[in-house]
From Swiss-Prot:
The keyword Isomerase applies. Substrate binds at F27, N129, F329. Responsible for synthesis of pseudouridine from uracil-13 in transfer RNAs. One of its GO terms (molecular function) is RNA binding. The active site is at D80 (nucleophile). Residues 155-303 form the TRUD domain. This is tRNA pseudouridine synthase D. Keywords: Isomerase, tRNA processing. It comes from Enterobacter sp. (strain 638). It is an enzyme of class 5 (isomerase). Its EC number is 5.4.99.27.
Length: 349
């Protein structure tokens, strides 16, 4: 398996170096749920600005403030502790009375707004995230400038970030040990992290192998194509290659790659053969996913950052702004721009 830092680059390996996240203010994330609170219901949506706190810690503190069980507070996704982030928490508080959440106090946190809502906020129930990143000590401004222009047009590989695999790849190592053992894993969190790491690593490998080909974004017979922004997909036949290629070129269709597991992967013919060959040297991880009945799925091969803009503060410092759909990784954008030191795994998804 190829390590995250060595996965194939869409625009070639960056020429310059730089520093990501010299301080928390260099990494700003604003969660976009894609909807507004209902204004009524037994739940309360709370928008929090935080710095230096992880999401679970804030959720537990909010539950304590409201005098409810911690399981009654939910969120759509984890946000990085060492960053400036805005996100929504959801607390189940039946009744007509509205608690005064302006009195909620926690170091590094501030309540921005809150309102009643009819439904529980569930994990993954967000549209995306808006990012503002500061890259410092950039050694090759011209190369970064060219890459930003290329990314705006051609996107980046939609890799799962190193965060998915844990510090030092610990989650993937856990999955490999589990795959080599018949012993059950009782800890639900470990099960989830390890299975997710296994499937994500296989997806990354499939994408990385395809991107080694100069015509990687050319549709082949049997490719599974996804409507942009949608989860549904269909298989390309020989008769419709020309038509679907036009739609891929104008970004209304996306070529997908397998997230292996039990059941059919979705691709057929040449495309299926290529995916199987890409991960032929990882039979243990594939067997683990099938043994644990993790269903196979599809994910777009490329990621197109939306609302991408940048501003050079000076020759070595650039501010980036972009929006990514849920499940995408800002670090997969940054790795196409600069080589960075340090472990991306300490940046929450």
């Amino acid at each position: 398996m190829t390590a995250f830092e060595n996965l194939t680059w869409l625009h070639g390996k960056p020429q310059g170096n730089g520093l990501l996240k010299a301080n928390p203010e260099d990494f700003v994330v604003v969660e976009d749920l894609g909807f507004e609170p209902d204004g009524e219901g037994e739940h309360i949506l709370v928008r929090i600005l935080k710095n230096g706190c992880n999401t679970r810690f804030v959720a537990d503190a909010l539950a304590k403030f409201l005098k409810i069980h911690a399981r009654e507070v939910s969120f759509a996704g984890q946000k990085d502790k060492h960053a400036v982030t805005e996100q929504w928490l959801c607390a189940r508080v039946p009744g007509n009375a509205m608690p005064d959440l302006s009195q909620f106090e926690l170091e590094g946190c501030k309540v921005l707004e809150y309102a009643r809502h009819k439904r529980k906020l569930r994990l993954g129930a967000l549209q995306g995230n808006a990012f503002t990143l500061i890259l410092r000590d950039v050694t090759d401004r011209d190369d970064v400038e060219k890459r930003l222009a290329a990314i705006a047009e051609q996107g980046v590989p939609n890799y799962f970030g190193a965060q998915r695999f844990g510090i030092g790849g610990s989650n993937l190592l856990g999955a490999l040990r589990w795959a080599q053992s018949d012993a059950p894993v009782r800890d639900r969190n470990k099960r989830s992290f390890w299975l997710s790491a296994a499937r994500s690593a296989l997806f990354n490998q499939i994408v990385s192998e395809r991107l080694k080909k100069p015509d990687a974004n050319q549709v082949v017979v049997g490719d599974a194509l996804q409507l942009a922004g949608r989860g549904s997909w269909f298989v390309a036949t020989a008769e419709e290659i020309t038509d679907v290629q036009t739609r891929v070129d104008n970004k209304t269709l996306m070529i997908t790659a397998a997230m292996p597991g039990s059941g059919e992967w979705g691709t057929q013919a040449d495309a299926l053969a290529a995916e199987q060959a890409a991960i032929a040297d990882a039979p243990e991880l594939q067997s683990l996913l099938m043994r644990e009945k993790v269903e196979a799925a599809r994910r777009a091969m490329l990621l197109y950052p939306q609302k991408l803009s940048w501003n050079w503060w000076d020759d070595v410092t650039v501010e980036l702004r972009f929006w990514l759909p849920a499940g995408s990784f800002a670090t997969s954008v940054v790795r196409e721009l600069i080589n960075t030191s340090g472990d991306y795994a300490n940046i929450a998804e």
